[in-house]
């Protein structure tokens, strides 16, 4: 510090208004202010010679407090307070001064506001007065302006009228007008425009002045008309010359001149008529190409009639024509926009209409006419290809006109293109006989062609329609349970139409197939059938020394036999479905408004071709094959190869169901009634096929059961009462034959039937055999050795059945095996045996019949010990 009574200058700087405390808080300022005095005390304390043990923290603190001198602090704080007091007084004085200044300025501001308010009011009053005066002046001047404008127009009309009368007088008196001629021949197009306007008005004036009372007026009118025609023709020639020279400035000038003369009607017509695209001889020669397109392009023709090709087919020459037309229209649009300006839209509109009428429509009709001569499929594919081609062509031009900004707000050109496109196709699409009728016939012909080979191969088998008759018989015998139900009514309606539809389809088939080809196929089929019939007799056991020969016959031999199903596959149905989808896609694109109705008709054709013809015929063949089986001639062999028809039919039904659900029904979300009809029709077809399949399987089970019965009838009574044990080494011949059949049945049926269908089929066959065997063994007397033979036979059956994996059958044949034990056990064990295992659930009458067939049944010992217990 500089003195004991004055504050250090560094602290004085912090006690001023411009930098008060220098950013320090009050506590920080006081600490900084006291720091110098505290440091002096600490330094003084450290210089003392204190004992070492007293230099700890407490000792130092105590020593400091003892040596602390408060006077420097008091003086410093007093000086600080003095400075703060002076600063406070200074601040208060400044505050009072500035407050007085603010009050004075507020008074002055208020006085100025009052004064300006008065001045503003005065100004507004003055403005209102001036506005009133101006309004009065406008009311006076406005009529004068209108009158002046009218006067100017009258003056101009007067001048024009005078000019017009003078020019008329020239023609009236001299038959010509030098002034008009000079204007016409001028190099300045605006003067040419003036001459045209004069002639336009002269034509009107001459028509009004023409009268028979003054013959010369008639002649004058003729002269003026002739001159006008000459002038217009010359302008048109100049226009054509300028077009050939690509002089667009000249073209624009002449177009403006003629537009003022007669609206540009003739120049527009001349521009279109004289266009090279319409008069070029090369273009005319190209028309002949469309007449011979199918003759020259054989590959294209093959594509059109190829069932397997489902892509959109576009004829090359038509594609080239459309590309050429599009290029011409785009190029001419640029020229027209520069030449005709405001009339450009109208000119392009006329040009487009002319192109469609002269270039497109004739070739369009020729192409369709020639395609129809090839086939219905070629016709509808050409029509669809043209629709696709012209759709892209129209959209491309519409986008181009929008980009070129040549189409006005009314979208005249877009509307014209769409109208031309619609007019081109409406004549065909909305006439049922020219499109959808042909589409239906095309699809019918395709389905006939795809199913014809299969149908012809099995013509003999399906001739009598035995399965369909069986189906009708099944319906008629279940009137109460079936016919009165909704499903029954559906099947009745379906059945009532199925026969007629199928007869129509067969008639259609006969008319569409080549007669020579048909007769050849039928001859071959009959020969094959004869050979098949002959070959089936090879399996007759009666002609063999032993039935064991037939036991070596396997399912692979049957698969390779001539009776194997042919030309019936999922691939064929898939191909047919693709054709149906193709027809549906065409209908959806060509006639979206009626698509829901036409899809229903297409699906009816599909069901007629695939279900009522293809599948029904296959099932008829399968039923015919099982019905023609002669159980007396085919001992040891059961050919179930016809089950392939059933397995394939099941897969086809699944495919049809999935296709209907995933492809066709989503298209009909907006047509719930049609959708419901299709669902009902689909369910009806599926239900009918299921019934037909069940009839075939039931007949198959019946035939197999009859076969088992016939084989069991060969059982000899002495088979189970042998005199020695010589025959214990082999099963009886009926058992061997039946086991062989069981193995063949399982091997074949497991190939064609799957899941529950296979299990149900095997269960029914096994139950039939079980019932037959249960009854069979109750009719034979059996001795103790014969009981072993019976057991061996049953073990053979049981082993074959266990391979099937059907639990219920395994239990039944286990029961049969336990029944065989009744022939072999000692009499005293019979009672306990019948109360154990499966025999506990068997009826007493069955057990009694088996026991009564024991050879020792009539012995006294047996009667005394057992017989009375089973009465």
Swiss-Prot record:
The keyword Transit peptide does not apply. One of its GO terms (biological process) is vesicle docking involved in exocytosis. The modification Phosphoserine is found at residues 142, 485, 507. InterPro entries: Sec10-like, Sec10_HB, Sec10_N. Residues 74-101 form a coiled coil. GO terms for cellular component: cellular bud neck; exocyst; mating projection tip. Disulfide bonds: none annotated. Keywords: Coiled coil, Exocytosis, Phosphoprotein, Protein transport, Transport. It holds the Pfam family Sec10_N. Belongs to the SEC10 family. Present with 2340 molecules/cell in log phase SD medium. The exocyst complex is composed of SEC3, SEC5, SEC6, SEC8, SEC10, SEC15, EXO70 and EXO84. Component of the exocyst complex involved in the docking of exocytic vesicles with fusion sites on the plasma membrane. This is Exocyst complex component SEC10. It comes from Saccharomyces cerevisiae (strain ATCC 204508 / S288c). The gene is SEC10.
């Amino acid at each position: 510090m500089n003195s004991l009574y004055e504050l250090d200058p560094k602290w004085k700087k912090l006690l001023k208004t411009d930098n008060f405390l220098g950013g320090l808080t009050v506590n920080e300022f006081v600490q900084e202010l006291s720091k110098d005095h505290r440091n002096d005390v600490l330094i003084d304390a450290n210089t003392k010679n204190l004992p070492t043990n007293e230099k700890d923290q407490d000792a130092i603190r105590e020593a400091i407090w003892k040596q602390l001198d408060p006077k420097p602090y008091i003086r410093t704080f007093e000086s600080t307070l003095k400075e703060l007091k002076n600063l406070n007084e200074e601040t208060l004085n400044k505050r009072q001064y500035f407050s007085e200044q603010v009050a004075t300025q507020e008074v002055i501001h208020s006085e100025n506001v009052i004064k300006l308010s008065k001045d503003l009011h005065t100004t507004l009053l003055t403005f209102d007065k001036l506005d009133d005066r101006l309004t009065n002046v406008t009311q006076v001047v406005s009529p004068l302006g209108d009158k002046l404008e009218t006067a100017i127009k009258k003056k101009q009309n007067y001048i024009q009228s005078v000019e017009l009368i003078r020019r008329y007088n020239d023609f009236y008196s001299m038959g010509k007008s030098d002034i008009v001629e000079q204007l016409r021949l001028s190099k300045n197009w605006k003067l040419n425009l003036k001459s045209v306007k004069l002639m336009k008005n002269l034509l009107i004036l001459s028509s009004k002045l023409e009268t028979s009372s003054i013959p010369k007026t008639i002649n004058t009118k003729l002269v003026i008309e002739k001159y006008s025609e000459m002038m217009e023709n010359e302008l048109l020639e100049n226009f054509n010359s300028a077009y050939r020279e690509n002089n667009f400035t000249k073209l624009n000038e002449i177009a403006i001149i003629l537009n003022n003369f007669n609206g540009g009607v003739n120049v527009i017509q001349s521009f279109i008529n004289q266009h090279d695209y319409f008069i070029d001889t090369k273009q005319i020669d190209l028309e002949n190409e469309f007449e011979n397109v199918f003759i020259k392009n054989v590959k294209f023709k093959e594509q059109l009639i190829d069932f397997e090709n489902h892509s959109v087919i576009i004829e090359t020459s038509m594609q080239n024509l459309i590309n050429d037309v599009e290029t011409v229209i785009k190029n001419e649009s640029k020229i027209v926009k520069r030449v005709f300006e405001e009339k450009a839209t109208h000119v392009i509109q006329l040009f487009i209409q002319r192109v469609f009428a002269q270039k497109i429509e004739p070739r369009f009709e020729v192409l369709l006419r020639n395609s129809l001569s090839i086939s219905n499929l070629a016709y509808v594919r050409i029509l669809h290809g043209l629709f696709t081609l012209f759709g892209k062509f129209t959209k491309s031009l519409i986008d181009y006109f929008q980009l070129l900004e040549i189409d006005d707000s009314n979208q005249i050109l877009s509307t014209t293109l769409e109208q031309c496109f619609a007019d081109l196709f409406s004549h065909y699409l909305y006439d049922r006989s020219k499109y959808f009728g042909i589409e239906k016939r095309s699809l019918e012909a395709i389905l006939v062609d795809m199913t014809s080979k299969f149908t012809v191969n099995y013509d003999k088998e399906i001739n009598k329609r035995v399965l369909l008759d069986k189906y009708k018989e099944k319906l008629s015998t279940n009137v109460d349970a079936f016919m009165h139900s909704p499903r029954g009514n559906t099947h009745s309606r379906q059945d009532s139409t199925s026969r007629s539809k199928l007869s129509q389809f067969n008639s259609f088939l006969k008319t569409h197939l080549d007669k020579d080809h048909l007769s050849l196929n039928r001859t071959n089929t009959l020969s094959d059938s004869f050979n098949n019939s002959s070959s089936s007799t090879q399996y007759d056991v009666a002609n063999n020394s032993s039935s064991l020969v037939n036991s070596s016959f396997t399912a692979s031999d049957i698969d390779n036999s001539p009776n194997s199903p042919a030309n019936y596959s999922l691939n064929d149905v898939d191909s047919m479905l693709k054709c149906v989808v193709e027809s549906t896609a065409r209908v959806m694109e060509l006639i979206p408004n009626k698509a829901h109705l036409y899809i229903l008709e297409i699906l009816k054709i599909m069901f007629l071709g695939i279900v009522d013809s293809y599948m029904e015929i296959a099932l008829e063949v399968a039923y015919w094959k099982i019905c023609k089986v002669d159980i007396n001639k085919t001992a040891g062999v059961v050919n179930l190869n016809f089950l392939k028809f059933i397995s394939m039919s099941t897969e086809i039904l699944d495919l049809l169901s999935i296709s209907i659900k995933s492809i066709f029904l989503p298209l009909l979300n907006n047509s719930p009634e049609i959708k419901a009809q299709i669902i009902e029709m689909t369910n009806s077809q599926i239900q009918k096929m299921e019934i037909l399949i069940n009839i075939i399987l039931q007949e198959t089970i019946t035939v197999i059961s009859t076969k088992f019965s016939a084989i069991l009838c060969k059982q000899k009574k002495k088979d189970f009462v042998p005199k020695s044990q010589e025959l214990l080494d082999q099963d009886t011949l009926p058992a061997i034959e039946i086991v062989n059949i069981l193995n063949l049945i399982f091997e074949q049926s497991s190939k064609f039937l799957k899941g529950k269908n296979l299990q149900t089929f095997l269960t029914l066959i096994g139950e039939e055999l079980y019932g037959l065997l249960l009854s069979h063994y109750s009719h034979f007397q059996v001795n103790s050795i014969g009981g072993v033979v019976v057991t061996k036979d049953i073990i053979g059956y049981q082993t074959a059945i266990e391979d099937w994996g059907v639990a219920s059958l395994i239990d039944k044949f286990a029961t049969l095996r336990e029944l065989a034990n009744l022939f072999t056990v000692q009499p005293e064990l019979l009672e306990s045996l019948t109360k154990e295992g499966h025999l506990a659930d068997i009826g007493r009458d069955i057990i009694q019949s088996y026991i009564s067939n024991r050879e020792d049944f009539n012995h006294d010992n047996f009667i005394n010990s057992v017989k009375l217990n089973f009465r």
